């Protein structure tokens, strides 16, 4: 199992992430930390940890001139750093799985053991991951998502699936594109509640909450999401802090991308596949909401 962790200014979290990986009941064969142009002590701490953890390797990326440092999400620098880590490894044919782990995510001690067991139990499983816990009001609480969506912060691909989809693309929305391509190739994508990880930075907050929601809306335009689906989705987003403004920012990002004709994913059959899935999920949500006592099960994510 190969794990790659793009890290930008994660000096506060990297040691905890490393200790959690070293304590895994099934640790990775190789963990590549990509110091992505950090301006804090991330590189120095990573180098020290690599002397202690035998499966850890550190690589650094050159400075990027094409990005506002406050808007790394827009140009998918995380995906770019991941691919540079992959290139540094070279031949990955000996690995059964390839994973991405963010530099602010601490895994439970048996996290990989549980996820790998799911792969062993289902040969059709292509992408898997656990649930993220975030600290809200002093308590670690799960941040639910659709069962078929795996958060980009802790994805694990089977080697066969990763090869079939051609790895990950370096553009906004990469962590939705890979899942759709996997399902188009006949693989399942699943998140599993029993496997938990603590996320020390709220999802979408690294570039500022509202900017993150704008980029989220733009990403969903790129991914080929339909207008009705996006409108329904915005109602859920609006419940995220800052309430109301988050939903408006999300819709603005989608509408602006549409107005600017931001290029969408242009793969034969891709958009039709996406919108067919969305119609199915919306129909299921409507049916669930119509059942007495089942309104809570109607979720559009």
Can you annotate each of these PLM segments?
Residues 35-45, 63-65:
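A conserved acidic beta->alpha catalytic loop
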């Amino acid at each position: 199992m190969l794990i790659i962790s793009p890290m930008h200014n994660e000096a506060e979290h990297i040691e905890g992430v490393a200790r959690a990986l070293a304590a895994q009941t099934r640790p990775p064969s190789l963990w590549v930390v990509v110091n992505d142009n950090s301006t804090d002590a991330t590189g120095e701490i990573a180098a020290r940890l690599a002397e202690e953890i035998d499966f850890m390797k550190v690589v650094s990326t050159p400075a990027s001139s094409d990005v506002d440092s406050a808007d790394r999400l827009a140009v998918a620098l995380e995906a770019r750093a991941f691919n540079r880590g992959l290139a540094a490894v070279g031949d990955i044919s000996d690995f059964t799985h390839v994973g991405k782990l963010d530099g602010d995510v601490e895994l439970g001690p048996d996290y990989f053991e549980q996820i790998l067991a799911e792969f062993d139990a289902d040969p059709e499983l292509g992408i898997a991951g656990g649930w993220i816990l975030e600290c809200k009001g002093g308590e670690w609480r799960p941040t639910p998502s659709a069962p078929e969506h795996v958060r980009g912060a802790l994805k694990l691909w089977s080697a066969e699936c990763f090869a079939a989809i051609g790895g990950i693309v370096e553009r906004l929305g990469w962590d939705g594109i890979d899942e759709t391509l996997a399902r188009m190739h006949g693989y399942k994508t699943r998140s599993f509640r029993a496997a938990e990880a603590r996320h020390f930075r709220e999802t979408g907050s690294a570039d500022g909450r509202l900017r993150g929601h704008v980029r989220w809306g733009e990403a969903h335009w790129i991914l080929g999401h339909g207008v009705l689906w996006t409108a329904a989705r915005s109602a859920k987003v609006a419940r995220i802090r800052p309430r109301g403004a988050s939903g408006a920012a999300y819709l603005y990002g989608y509408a602006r991308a549409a107005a600017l004709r931001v290029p969408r994913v242009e793969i034969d059959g891709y958009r039709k596949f996406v919108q067919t899935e969305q119609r199915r999920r919306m129909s299921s949500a409507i049916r669930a909401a119509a059942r007495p006592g089942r309104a809570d099960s109607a979720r559009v994510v």
